[in-house]
């Protein structure tokens, strides 16, 4: 092989590598911060509602799929908000606020009723207000100021931060891709055998233990599927009319 051949090869390949770098860099610049922030939000959720965080962390280390099933919904929500708003800080902040509120609600319900947060609880606004009235006025005041301050930060992030320029087709493809991924992943969250395959810390029939062992996010989404009413085999609606 002559010395000229490697040089010619490099001359041919370098332009292609530059094109690839130009394509990948914007994607990585967006994907990597969202990826790490999704893990950070998941860690925050686990820290808020897990009584034995080290045991949950041990489960995550032994079963990486369990960690992925808790992180992926956070990442998908961030991506969806990012493609809609075109603002990364706003998307991360709103996602963190939503999942943190979910974790706080689960922690309060678990401590007061020994039951985890269920999808049906989202419709019980009156009951939630009744529970809030049992808290001291100072706690409610601090919580209200905290929520208002957080909302102001979100509004500032939405209005002041410069949004990334997306072509309309690119935004639609991004939103469609996120929704498609969510639809496909839902088969994993609906799977009872998969849910039962992960170990439970303590009594396996106690739902609070299931949430503490598998993570709030995964367990909540599994319950959202498990609580759906299904028609029995051979059921004919006309026969009961």
Which functions belong to the PLM regions below?
Residues 95-241:
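N-terminal secretory/membrane-targeting segments
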Residues 2-122:
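Extended, compositionally biased non-globular segments that define protein topology
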């Amino acid at each position: 092989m002559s010395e000229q051949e490697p040089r010619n090869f490099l001359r041919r390949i370098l332009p292609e590598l530059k094109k690839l770098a130009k394509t990948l860099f914007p994607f990585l610049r967006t994907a990597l911060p969202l990826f790490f922030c999704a893990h950070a939000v998941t860690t925050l959720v686990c820290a808020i509602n897990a009584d034995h965080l080290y045991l949950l962390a041990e489960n995550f280390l032994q079963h990486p799929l369990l960690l992925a099933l808790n992180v992926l919904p956070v990442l998908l929500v961030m991506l969806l908000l990012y493609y809609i708003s075109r603002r990364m800080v706003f998307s991360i902040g709103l996602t963190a606020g939503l999942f943190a509120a979910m974790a706080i609600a689960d922690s309060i319900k678990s401590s007061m009723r020994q039951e985890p947060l269920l999808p049906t609880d989202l419709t019980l606004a009156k009951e939630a207000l009744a529970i809030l009235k049992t808290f001291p006025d100072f706690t409610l005041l601090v919580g209200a100021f905290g929520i208002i301050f957080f909302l102001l930060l979100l509004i500032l992030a939405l209005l002041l931060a410069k949004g990334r320029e997306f072509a309309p087709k690119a935004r639609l493809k991004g939103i469609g891709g996120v929704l498609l991924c969510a639809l496909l992943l839902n088969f994993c969250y609906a799977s009872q055998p998969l849910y039962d395959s992960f170990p439970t810390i303590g009594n396996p029939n106690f739902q609070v233990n299931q949430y503490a062992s598998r993570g709030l996010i995964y367990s909540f989404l599994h319950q959202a599927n498990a609580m759906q009413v299904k028609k029995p085999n051979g059921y004919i609606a006309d026969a009961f009319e």
